[in-house]
A protein has these predicted regions:
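Short, compact, well-ordered microdomains
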Residues: 86-123
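N-terminal signal peptide c-region/cleavage motif recognized by signal peptidases
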Residues: 14-18
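Short N-proximal segments of mature Sec-exported proteins
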Residues: 22-86
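Bacterial N-terminal signal peptides that target proteins for export
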Residues: 1-7
């Protein structure tokens, strides 16, 4: 009985959350970099809103990295989410002009691809 109610409610919640996110969030390379800067400060020093932004940054990077890994574009089973976040953040920091040139997904793909490409790791 509970599962018959729970599944539609969860699906509705997921759908409504994604629609809301699409309508209210405008993420670009600079806002992605801002998330990295907050992540770098450490969660002990952030207010709730900044903590959410830092978590969003880490989650975004983890999602892109997970997708690239599943498609065998990047390879490194021992890397942590924090290391992936650092790779993308360092790229954003050292390439400020790229932040407005590419989408956040493209920026993360470029950064992770440069450091963790399967072909690069197999030649080492």
């Amino acid at each position: 009985m509970i599962s018959k109610i729970t599944i539609p409610v969860v699906l509705l919640f997921c759908f409504s959350t994604s629609v809301l996110a699409k309508s209210t969030l405008n993420i670009d390379g600079n806002s992605l970099y801002h998330g990295y800067q907050l992540y770098e400060k450490g969660f002990d020093y952030l207010n709730v809103r900044d903590e959410q932004t830092a978590v969003m940054y880490m989650s975004f990077v983890a999602g892109v990295a997970g997708t690239l890994s599943k498609e065998n574009i990047i390879c490194n089973e021992s890397i942590t989410i924090g290391q992936e976040a650092d790779i993308v953040g360092n790229f954003l920091q050292t390439h400020p002009k790229e932040r407005t040139k590419y989408s956040p997904s493209e920026l993360a793909m470029i950064a992770l691809g440069k450091e963790l490409a399967c072909s690069k790791n197999s030649n080492s």
